[in-house]
Curated annotation (Swiss-Prot):
Source domain of life: Eukaryota
Alphabetical list of InterPro entries matching this protein: SCL35B1-4/HUT1 (IPR013657)
Protein name, entry field: Endoplasmic reticulum GDP-fucose transporter
Organism, scientific name: Drosophila melanogaster (Fruit fly)
Similarity comment text for this entry: Belongs to the nucleotide-sugar transporter family. SLC35B subfamily.
Name of the gene: Efr
Amino acid sequence: MALNLKALLGMLFVFIGCCSNVVFLELIIQIDPGAGNLITFAQFLFIALEGLVFTSKFFTVRPKIALKDYVILVALFFGANVCNNYAFNFNIPMPLHMIFRSGSLMANMIMGIVLLKKRYNLRQYSSVAMITAGIILCTLVSSGDVKDNTHHSLKVDTSYSDFFWWTVGIGLLTIALLVTAYMGIYQEVIYKKYGKHPSEALFFTHMLPLPGFLIMAGNIVQHFGIAWSSEPVAVPLLGAIGLEWKFPLMLFYLLCNVVTQYVCISAVYVLTTECASLTVTLVVTLRKFVSLLFSIIYFRNPFTLNHWVGTILVFFGTILFANVINQVRDAYRARSSRKTHFDTAPLAKKVE
C-alpha cells in the first residue's frame, strides 16, 4: 500500500509525540502518582486553546458536526481520559497501565457484539482470546507486587489495604477501556453522517469538557501545589551573560507532557483520515510496544518472565486480529504478479 507524505509524517509524529509523551508522564508520576487530574486538565486546556485560535478562530468558523453529537462524544472522551490518568493514584504501575490499554481490540469486539450485533470469525476470536489472556496474566502477576505509590504529602492512615486500592485502579482502567470502545463506535457513526473533520473534532472534544474539571478543582489545585514546590531546575535564558531562571522540575515535565500529547493526538487524528484502520491499529500498537520496552529498560520497572509472556500474547494477538500476515502475503503476491506481468510483456510482443 502506497502512503502519501502526510500519512508518513503522521506515523513519524505518532512515534515522536506518543513515545516521548509516555516518558514525561512516567517522570511526572514518579514525583507525584496522584497528578492524573492535573495532567488531564493541562492537556485539555492546551489543546482547547490551540483549537480556539487556529481551528475555531474564536468561534467564527461554523462547526460541521452538530454540537449535540459532540456533547455525547465529549462525555465519553472526558470520562475515559479521567479514568485512565486517575488510575495512577491507585497503585497502578506504568507497564501494567500500557498493557491494559492495549486491550482496546477486545473491548471493541465486545461492544461490536453487544451494540452492533456483529459476527466475527475464528481468527478474530482467537486473537482476542490471546489479548485477554495476556492482560489477565500481566494483571495477576502485578497484583503480587502491589505497593503504595501515594505522594508522601498526601498519605493518610487507612484500614484498607494497598491491594484494595489496586483493584480500584484496575476497575478504573476497565471502565476506561469499555468507554473508549463505545466512543470509537459512536465516532464512526458521526463520521459516516457528517464526514471526517479531525481538527474540529480535536478542538470540541477538548474544549467542551473544561467546565467538568470544576468538580476536581480541589484535587487539581492540591497537586499543582506539589508540582510548584518540586525541585527547581535551572533554565538558561541568556547563556552569554550567565542568566538563569529556576523552574519547578515537575512543571517542566508537565509542560513537555502537554506539548507531546498535542503532537501525539494530532498525528493520530491525521492517520485516521489518511490511512486504513488496519494501518492505524498497527502503528498505534507498535508505538505502545516501543513505549513499554523503553519504560522497562530506562525506568527499570519490574518486569518478569510472566510479564513478557503476557506482553507477547497481547502484541501478537493484535497482529493476528489485524490479519497482518495475510495482508502482507496478499500484498507480496500482488506485487509479484505485477512484476511477472511486466517481465513477460516484452516477450509477448516479440512472439507477435
